[in-house]
Amino acid sequence: MAAARPFLKMHGAGNDFVVLDARAHPLDLAPAAAARIADRHRGVGCDQIILIERDDGAAAFMRILNADGSESGACGNATRCVAALLAGETGARRLTIRTNAGLLPAEIKGPTLVEVDMGAPKLGWEDIPLAEPADTLSLRLALGPVQNPAACSMGNPHATFFVDDLTHLQIETIGPKLEHARLFPERANIGFARIDAPDRIRLRVWERGAGLTLACGSGACAALVNAHRRGLAARRAEIEMDGGTLTLTWRDDGHVLMEGPVALVFEGELDAAMLAP
């Protein structure tokens, strides 16, 4: 049985994480253990579990496990949190973190403010991926009051529905059905965006493997990209989510920059039973 391990509870704009440092002592966390830790009633509770691992070509490798135990390629809010931790160790203002989605450069902007270069979105249907060829600017997909989302990949698949009313939208009902739609062979993160101004977007996200979260960094990136592609938003906008606001910039070179807050909530220890497969 695995030994007890220290952890940090962190969040970025309310998107919360259990962070485990596995650089000195590697940890092979089974999906069942990840789901146990993420349980908000019987575990610590979080949207994702983050494992910080050694990497010879970057400051660290960041492994991301969703609340259901599945693995994710990218998480912008978690990247900011890990960047802040690593910068605190070394004093570096700029560093690069490797994820399954690639290398993500980060810059410390303030004591609790971090910017991450999330890379360039992938817009081809096969890159998201979709189950069949389709125009990713307007998918033939509808459920209840929402229809025809735009899709892209920010290291993980995203579909963004543009709506006029977020208040009465039953996201807990339609979110899981859209996540598992046949069009998305790897499932998808589902965003619901209301355009308040060309530089202001209100967003709620049903995250693949995590459900409705207070914030989703890659979802915010996808919302800006898809809104700009539709002619609904500028290349720079404030993305307001339930847990806070992120500042997004889609640069002319194609890269998306995401700036937002990070916070350390508390420290603790996971016992061996919690870590067991």
UniProtKB/Swiss-Prot annotation:
PROSITE patterns: DAP_EPIMERASE
Protein name, per record: Diaminopimelate epimerase
Binding partners and assembly: Homodimer.
Keywords assigned: Amino-acid biosynthesis, Cytoplasm, Isomerase, Lysine biosynthesis
Protein EC: 5.1.1.7
Organism: Acidiphilium cryptum (strain JF-5)
GO biological process: lysine biosynthetic process via diaminopimelate
PANTHER family: DIAMINOPIMELATE EPIMERASE, DIAMINOPIMELATE EPIMERASE, CHLOROPLASTIC
Active-site residues, Swiss-Prot/TrEMBL: 75, 216
Name of one Pfam family that matches: DAP_epimerase
Catalytic activity field: (2S,6S)-2,6-diaminopimelate = meso-2,6-diaminopimelate
Single GO cellular component term: cytosol
SUPFAM superfamilies xref list: Diaminopimelate epimerase-like
Biochemical pathway: Amino-acid biosynthesis; L-lysine biosynthesis via DAP pathway; DL-2,6-diaminopimelate from LL-2,6-diaminopimelate: step 1/1
Keyword Nucleotidyltransferase: no
InterPro entries: DAP_epimerase_AS (IPR018510), DAP_epimerase_DapF (IPR001653)
